[in-house]
């Protein structure tokens, strides 16, 4: 295993490619992640802020979010397969993605999940607003959180529904973060002791895990965002 970029009592950050690092990891109770969406690849026309990482943030000079669609599907299936192998028998993956319009049809995130991995539920993240310059389809204002779960996985609540109305956050360090409150809800409604985010970005998953008293591992390809996440996670948990 590589030396951590940053580590404290709750959080460990690794700088590198998740496909290379995942085989060294195990005993993960929950994966919470949001990969690049490939919005510039093969004619995708999805509106909204999106995840055009190279255009919106200089932390990803080698990734323009424009892979050929078949290559992108193969990559994401490989990542999800590697994540599945890190889980405990009661573990689960919360995989944040979105429907994308490519050509004349919508591409659903379900195609990115290997056939042997059971998608138990689709949680709708209602962002409240969106943006679209294309009149061939309506303004997209929601994303998906796929719950991909081992048979023994259970939530710790019976009161949380499958539509999460959480406004997206603007003006952060990363071009496409999900809100801290979304990460807090996902982690807080499980009893997972160890959380993993293989596309860590600015460290939202890790910050939420630390605030909830859980341990977390983050993997990030960009050294710039490793540093941003490390500074964010180095802050002590505030007493409420």
Spans of features found by a protein language model:
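Core catalytic lobe of class I
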Residues: 2-227
């Amino acid at each position: 295993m590589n030396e951590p970029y940053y580590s404290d009592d709750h959080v460990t950050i690794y700088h590198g490619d998740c496909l290379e690092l995942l085989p060294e990891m195990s005993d993960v109770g929950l994966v919470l992640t949001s990969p690049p969406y490939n919005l510039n690849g093969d004619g995708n026309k999805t509106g909204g802020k999106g995840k055009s990482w190279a255009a919106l943030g200089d932390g990803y000079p080698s990734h323009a979010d424009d892979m050929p669609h078949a290559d992108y599907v193969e990559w994401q299936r490989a990542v999800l397969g590697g994540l599945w192998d890190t889980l405990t028998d009661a573990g689960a993956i919360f995989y944040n993605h979105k429907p994308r319009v490519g050509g004349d049809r919508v591409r659903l995130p379900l195609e990115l999940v290997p056939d042997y991995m059971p998608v138990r539920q689709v949680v709708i993240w209602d962002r409240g607003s969106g943006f679209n310059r294309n009149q061939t389809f309506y303004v997209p204002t929601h994303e998906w959180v796929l719950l991909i779960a081992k048979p023994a996985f259970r939530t710790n609540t019976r009161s949380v529904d499958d539509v999460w109305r959480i406004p997206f956050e603007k003006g952060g360090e990363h071009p496409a973060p999900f809100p801290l409150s979304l990460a807090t809800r996902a982690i807080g409604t499980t009893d997972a002791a160890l959380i993993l985010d293989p596309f860590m970005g600015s460290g939202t998953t890790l910050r939420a895990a630390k605030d909830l008293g859980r341990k977390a591992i983050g993997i990030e390809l960009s050294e710039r965002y490793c540093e941003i996440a490390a500074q964010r996670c180095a802050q002590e948990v505030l007493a409420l």
